[in-house]
Amino acid sequence: IGRTKEANEEIDGDERPETSHLTRVDLKEDGKGLKIVRQSLPYGTASGTHGLYFCAYCARLHNIEQQLLSMFGDTDGKRDAMLRFTKPVTGGYYFAPSLDKLMAL
């Protein structure tokens, strides 16, 4: 995943495997990080239906698209190792316009 198991500390970028989740989603363009705000919430029980609700927000759709392309190996053929243990079931993109955009309608 890109963190130590013992202390849950982030592994330095040079030492992280190329397929770690952090390596696949901690992307930079022109030296600047592709910023997103993310929140996740686990649901269910260990013995029953269970999973993780994940929501991300960003100013540009490009940021999330690049992360997804990287996770699924479309950029360099290396897939996020987390995908060996998880199963994406559904997803969606939603546009939340600014107040200025709404007022201009």
Briefly describe each language-model feature range.
Residues 1-105:
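Long, histidine/aromatic-enriched segments associated with O2/redox biology
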